[in-house]
Structures are given as structure tokens and as C-alpha cells.
Amino acid sequence: MKVITILEPGKVEITEKEMPEVKEGEALLKILYGGICGSDLGTYRGTFAYASYPRIPGHEFSAQIVEIGENDRGLKPGMIVTCNPYFNCQRCYSCERGLVNCCETNETMGAQRDGAFSEYITMPVERIYDGMGLNPRQLALIEPFCISYHGVSRADIKKGDKVLVIGAGTIGVLAAVAAKAKGGEVYIADIAEEKLQYAYKTFGFAGMIKNDSEESLANSVSQITGEHHGFDVCIEAVGLPSTFQNCMDAAAYGGRIVLIGVGKKNLDFNFTLIQKKELSIFGSRNALKADFKELIELVKCGGIDLEKIVMNKGCADAAKRSEYELEEAAAAFEEFHQYGGSKLKVLIHFSDPSEITEHNR
């Protein structure tokens, strides 16, 4: 079978690998669509904190069940599904308290272990979720929405809260969508004009901020919230020291800050600002089983049009293209790297669903 492998920073190849062996308690899945996450792109660039090589990327995906044994989940061959890609130990202190998303030895597909960018993978049955009739593109977008939704939930947003999301990539935009759904008055900031305009117009946020300098951001914060007020909630969805500092500067006294972005660099800052403003700062990692189930249902009911996160559908221009075939994986990564300012989510099409009529194993 064909497998996408990042051999080293800047080098993607399609390699051949044996079909995986299905073990007890696992299912064989055929991958349909995969989304290139910011962490996958970071692995390609050599900037992701958890990167190692060679690595099969991919933890945002939809799949079709090919083989599955008897189970109590109602899962059968032929079903279109998505999966929880965070492997936890179930033994550490975090797992014992139900905080499996921040397991001390967590292994996320495509990061600490090989990912889903293969024609076929095996997956423990308990990590597979019925797609509830959503199409394969939608299901490939559920996992990043879960990341954003989980982070936003940490902020305890109340109706009318002024919310600033810094970062107009996939995670940032979906965080803004989630914050709006929770009743927030949402503003989104970024340096990439095209993505910023698209997100603002497409999802109907209260406003947008071109975050091209500290002065520009400060002026916008004052105009929106009133002089010396600031935002009730700031969500960092980039992973840079500068954007974390932006959040502390933009937050109101008594404000809440959530860090979703993942970075490698240390930040030298005046920590007295946290004490002075009495800021509450929350980390956010991965997502929970409940997030997946809740958001599949939300999208099914029409609450969110997830496919809008894919810009320029059908466009063949390398600078704007957002969908690629498996054989074009190297181009997908390189063009996302080169033209990230004009792309939100990039999808790779692996295969279409097929008629599967075999009985459960």
C-alpha cells in the first residue's frame, strides 16, 4: 500500500509498505480524506516541537471500515467514520482522573507515533466514531474542530464576552466559530490579509484585526473595547512567543487567556503583568471523546458548515489550491508551506468509499 512519509524537513515521499495486520480489538480502515494539520506542516518545516523523522503524518482523517470484529459500538464494515488519534496510557495520574487528553505519555498520530496518511490503517475499535451520515470531507475536519472547541471550553465564555482569537489558521478560525457559538462577540487577528478577510466574511465574526505590529494591535484593542479595557477572553492559536504576549497585552483586567497553539520557542516576558491584571491563563491540549461525539452531532444538525474552512474549492492555482490527490502529497506540503497565507485547510484525497458487503469478522 502507498504511504506518505516525511523523511526529513522539506522532504516528502510516497513509499510502499505492507498492509497492516489487524489485531484483536482493532478494525481495518481505508482512508478517504486527510487534512494537513499545522503540526504536520511544522514537521515538514522542522519547527514542530514533537517532530521526529522519518514520520508518517496525519491525525485529521475520515475512513471507511473494511474489517471489524463483533463490537458493542454498532460499527460495521462499510461505515464511514472518523477517529480519536490521541493514544493514552490509561495508567498515569492524568488518565486516572479522566484527563486522558493530557496523558503524561500521550502519543498523537503523526506526532509521537506514525499517522493516518496511508491507504489503510488499523485502529482500536474504541477510538472509532460513527460518522452519522456526514460526508468524508466533513469528517476529516472534525478533529481540528475538536481541538478548537476543547480550548474554547476552557475559557468559560459567557454571552456577550468580547473574545479575541489570535491566529486565522484552521485552529484559530474554528476556535472563533466555537466562541461565537457560545455567545461571544468574536474578533479575529492575523497578519495574513487573505485568510483574515475570508474568515471574517465567511463566518460572520464581529470584526477583524490586522496584527502586523504591536501598535496596530493596541490601537485596535482600544477602538473595540474602549481605552484601557481589553478583551474578556483571548485565545492564542499560533504558538509563537509574540502572539502569547499579544494576548496578555490585549486581555482585560481579570481576563482569561487560552493557549491552543504549539511552539518550540521560549518567551521572555514581564510576568508581573499576569499578577497586575489578575489574568487566568489556561493551557489546552488535544480533545476528549465527548468533544468528538458532540461536534459530529452539531455538524449533522446543521449548526456549523465545516466545509467552509476549505478555501478556494476546485482552484488549481498552486498559491490557492486546497485539495490534492495522494500522488500529489509532496506538492501539497510544499505549496502549503509556500502559500500558507492564502490557504486555511489543505485536504488530501486518498480514496472514495466503496461497496463493502463482507460480514463482521
Write out the residue ranges for each language-model feature:
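Glycine-rich beta-strand-centered segment in the early N-terminal region that forms part
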Residues: 20-34, 47-93, 132-134
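Cysteine-cluster motifs in flexible loop/terminal segments that predominantly coordinate metals
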Residues: 37, 75, 84-132
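Mid-domain Rossmann-like dinucleotide-binding core that forms the NAD(H)/NADP(H) cofactor-binding site
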Residues: 134-213
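Residues in the short beta-alpha loop(s) of Rossmann-like NAD(P)-binding domains
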Residues: 192, 263, 287
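Glycine-rich cofactor phosphate-binding loops and adjacent beta1-alpha1 units
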Residues: 201-280, 356
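C-terminal hydrophobic helical "lid"/dimerization subdomain
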Residues: 245-249, 289-361
